[in-house]
């Protein structure tokens, strides 16, 4: 039986899930670095680092990965999804409810800024193999009302069952009957909320082969002290540095703060979600915070527990390239990093050879050139003149040492690497509105475009299926929590 009753039990589950995915994290960090134009990095087992190279060495970056990812996201999200709600029966009431559901989804798509969340989740799935959307009810957002509380702390209700607003006739009447016994409280209306989660924040059941089979998961995030106090009513000391960026946070000494400066700190918040099981017939949700003292002692405190959450698994996952027998898919960047590294090396070698031709090595006689510093200064000027002594030796005159030319097979590597990256990504010339050499027939061009689109078809199908699941979750939340009249714009 899985133990999840105490904060220590939850921390143990967190450790198990973290160790299960530890071998994938280095690849995620490298993928992010390559996408962000940091492509001369390596992983030393703990963090990213730049291998030491001479200052004169050219480290050119010709980032072909970023446009590939952006094109793939554009191909998958160029059309706004259309949600279709099917009525349960042919009754007019069910038909009207289905029409209302479709109108409501159009409203929620704009109201919740779903396009931006969708793009961010897709970006994570293309770079790291998985991106998540979390759909839940947030009682702290929306317009606020001042309600009346009875002496026992419950809301004062009117005859129709609705809560009484402060200052209303019902409030005045109840207060006159029991002067001074009533209090008021500001309560938000609440609303549906959608947030993006990266694979770095998700610690999923290690026994599952796909996300739908996950029995539990833990989400980790860093929040401000005020956020924790507003949501859970407790004050927790911040001890976790704010994240400057996932790649930058793993760069070690290159991004260390200067002496005398302190980082902006936050609170490490963890959230446990569990599907129904023997211990939790209706599922379970727990929120706890983990702090570390100055002596290195780790303390944990459970802030909230819900033994009957409305949705015990409020996440959908956008997947990359499926890997048999593994929960986390791989990303196309994993396969592109090798060719991208070789492309950078070849182009850096060409740049170094170009620099040698523009600033060649000179041969000069020590007897003919009396002042070496003055000679070096003159040859660096345009049209500079330097007088040398003709000592009668054939080697007295300074001469240029010709730089060796690169073999043809080095320059031939660039088109080969480019073709390899096109095959890996499924983005050939036709995907970039370019006609391949020798192809003139319209039917042939259409076949090539169809071949590129076919390669991405499984990803598009998975994306549409997950969007459908998200739509169902949104409508279920609205049906359960929209208990008061609201105005929506269609």
Regions inferred by a protein language model and the residue ranges of each:
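Extended amphipathic alpha-helical segments with heptad-repeat/coiled-coil character used for oligomerization
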Residues: 139, 408, 443-490
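A generic secondary-structure signal for well-formed alpha-helical elements
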Residues: 108, 112-116, 135-141, 206, ...
């Amino acid at each position: 039986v899985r133990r999840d009753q105490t904060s220590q039990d939850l921390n143990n589950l967190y450790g198990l899930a973290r160790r299960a995915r530890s071998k994938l994290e280095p690849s995620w960090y490298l993928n992010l670095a390559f996408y962000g134009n940091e492509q001369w990095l390596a992983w030393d087992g703990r963090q990213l680092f730049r291998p030491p190279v001479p200052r004169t060495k050219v480290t050119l970056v010709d980032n072909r990965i970023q446009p590939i990812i952006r094109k793939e996201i554009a191909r998958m999200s160029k059309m706004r999804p259309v949600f279709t709600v099917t009525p349960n029966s042919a009754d007019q009431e069910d038909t009207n409810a289905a029409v209302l559901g479709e109108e409501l989804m159009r409203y929620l798509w704009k109201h919740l800024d779903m396009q931006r969340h969708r793009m961010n989740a897709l970006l994570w799935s293309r770079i790291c193999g998985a991106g998540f959307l979390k759909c839940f009810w947030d009682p702290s957002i929306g317009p606020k009302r001042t309600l009346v509380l009875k002496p026992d702390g419950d809301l004062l209700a009117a005859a129709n069952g609705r809560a009484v607003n402060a200052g209303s006739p019902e409030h005045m009447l109840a207060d006159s009957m029991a002067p001074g016994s009533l209090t008021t409280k500001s309560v938000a209306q609440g609303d549906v909320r959608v947030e993006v989660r990266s694979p770095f924040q998700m610690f999923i059941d290690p026994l599952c082969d796909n996300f739908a089979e996950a029995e539990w998961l833990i989400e980790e995030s860093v929040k401000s002290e005020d956020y924790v106090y507003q949501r859970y009513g407790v004050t927790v000391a911040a001890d976790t540095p704010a994240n400057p960026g996932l790649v930058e946070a793993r760069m070690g000494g290159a991004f260390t703060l200067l002496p005398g400066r302190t980082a902006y700190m936050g609170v490490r918040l963890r959230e446990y979600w569990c599907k129904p099981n023997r211990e939790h017939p209706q599922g379970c949700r727990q929120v706890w915070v983990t702090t570390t003292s100055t002596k290195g002692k780790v303390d944990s405190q459970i802030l909230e527990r819900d033994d009957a959450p409305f949705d015990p698994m409020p996440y959908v996952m956008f997947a990359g390239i499926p890997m048999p027998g593994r929960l986390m898919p791989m990303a196309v960047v994993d396969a592109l990093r090798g060719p991208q590294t070789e492309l950078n090396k070849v182009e850096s070698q060409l740049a170094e050879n170009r620099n040698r031709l523009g600033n060649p090595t000179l041969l000069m006689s020590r007897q003919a050139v009396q002042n070496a510093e003055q000679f070096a200064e003159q040859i660096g000027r345009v049209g500079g003149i330097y007088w040398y002594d003709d000592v009668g030796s054939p080697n007295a005159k300074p001469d240029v040492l010709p730089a060796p030319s690169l073999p043809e097979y080095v320059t031939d590597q660039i088109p080969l690497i480019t073709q390899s990256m096109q095959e890996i990504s499924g983005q050939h010339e036709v995907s970039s509105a370019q006609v391949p050499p020798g192809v003139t027939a319209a039917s042939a061009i259409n076949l090539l475009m169809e071949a590129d689109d076919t390669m991405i078809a499984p990803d598009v199908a998975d994306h549409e299926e997950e969007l459908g699941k998200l739509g169902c979750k949104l409508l279920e939340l609205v049906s359960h929590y929209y208990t008061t009249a609201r105005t929506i714009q269609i």
